Amino acid sequence: MAVPDLPPPHPRSRECSDEAARHALAALPGPYLPWGSSAMRPAGLVAVCNDIVVNGRRRVVELGSGISTVLLARLLNQRPPLGGFRVAAVEHDAGWAQWVREQLNREGTGSQVVIVHAPLVPHPLAEPGLSWYDAAALAEGLRTAMRGEPIDLLVVDGPPAHGAGHGLARYPALPGLRDRLGPGATVVLDDAERPGEQEVLRRWERETGLHFDRRAEATGVAVARLAGEDPVTGPRHS
């Protein structure tokens, strides 16, 4: 049965969620970051940070890099007792990947994250006319960052999917990386309120049997957890 489309988010609900999230993110201080419209919403980023802290995620892969990458590195840098973190941020744009890498180095957190430059190329899992990350570059980057261990948090915020005809650009993420996910892993899809991402979620659910908790109005993200360990859900936005 098809999942009905989400209603449009109430502007005030978004404002309240993001305002509360900004207060939480103030605990990750550092230099000013250029937060643009394409960045993950503050409420979505807090949902990701909650999963890392509450469920002890240590092997994180982020598709699409930027402000979220820098803030996640700040979080990991704050919490040395957790230890053993392996983080890969996959980016198709070489110039932007370099900016993120340099920003991490300026903040002294460059050792926390491996920036993987993987250009967008034709891919067998992509829709006709669309591209996904170069398989060889992605595999090599994940091999370096994960060192053969399974991913326990996958954040899908790339490649760009906002342009006309690009709504399904992020579909390959789950079928392409499913075999790399460990038991109990969390999958997060950003921009879950958009029609293209809603269709991606429907396909993922139909093909994998996963159920995505759609938090688009409050956080902008949809979240699912694979079978396995019983995670603590942690605080949620109301």
Placement of each model-derived feature along the sequence:
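Rossmann-like AdoMet
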Residues: 1-39
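Surface-exposed cleft-lining segments at the edges of enzyme active sites
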Residues: 33-37, 124-125, 160-165
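SAM cofactor-binding core of SAM-dependent methyltransferases
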Residues: 38-122
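Local beta-strand N-terminus motif with an aromatic residue
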Residues: 57, 150-152, 184
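Short, conserved loop/helix-junction motifs that constitute active-site signature segments
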Residues: 79-81, 147-148, 177-183
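S-adenosyl-L-methionine
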Residues: 101-149
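Short SAM/SAH-binding signature in class I
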Residues: 146-158
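C-terminal substrate-binding/active-site "lid" region of AdoMet-derived donor-dependent transferases
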Residues: 159-238
